[in-house]
Amino acid sequence: MTGSGPWGAFEPRFYFTKYPDGLEGDPARGWGFRTEIGTAVVPTFESFKKFMPKENWWPRDEMWNKHYFGQNAFNAAPDRYDASITKGFGKPEGIEDYCRKAQLVNIESNKAMYEGWLDRMWEDASGIMTWMGQSAYPSMVWQTYDYYYDLTGAFWGAKSACEPVHILWNPVTDGVKIANTTARDMEGLTAEVKVYNMDGKSVEAYTQSAIVNSPSNSTVQCFTIGFNKERKNLSLNKPTFASSTTYG
């Protein structure tokens, strides 16, 4: 048992890193079985407009706090959630755009939350319980389906990660693994990775595939993506020019 929390959405790498302490937990215990963990989860726009008065739609104001997106639910880290939307998917241009991009953060964070434990299955990690499945009040935090029973991105992220045989990428180690939570051994599975650049073109140098056997109730390594980690300085060996004069 490793305590409760955290309850705010983090970037995927967080869930694969040596695990931070939860409330009443011991950081030395690592992943273990986390009895309560969750993220802020903004609902879809269709649900949002049912409970939020139109004059309070945008930008975020004190009325949002009454639906737990502010100081009333500070441990859901709403400011970090908003920053994640802007960093990952661009600054929202209005409430509809905000709710749409929020679903992508919901998917990403909740998928990674489960995958972080699957990545270390039985190597200190035994499971998690999500706080929480559904909100009993129109809310913007801690739900996989909302007050109106509409599915959020958190549901789809968790569903993807929890498929019985699941392939995952560890963004910290760049390892690709197969998690098999069934009672049946799987043989001759094909694991393949393709990496695409910002133009949508495949970067063939990173394409890999492997035939993998996946024992029941375990996670196995397929391969590691060979990203270049040695050169962090993108300007290294590039010609530069400088001047100390007013006119350059």
Regions inferred by a protein language model and the residue ranges of each:
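Intrinsically disordered, low-complexity segments enriched in small/polar residues
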Residues: 3-6, 36, 68, 186, ...
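Intrinsically disordered, low-complexity Pro/Gly/Ser/Thr-rich segments with frequent PxxP/GP/PP motifs
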Residues: 189-231
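Residues that act as N-cap/strand-start positions at coil-to-secondary-structure junctions
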Residues: 161-163, 204, 234
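Polar, glycine-rich mid-to-C-terminal structural blocks
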Residues: 1-33, 193, 197-199
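Substrate-binding clefts and catalytic carboxylate motifs of secreted carbohydrate-active enzymes
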Residues: 15, 19-187
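Disordered, acidic Ser/Thr/Pro-rich linker "stalks" and the adjacent N-terminal cap
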Residues: 232-248
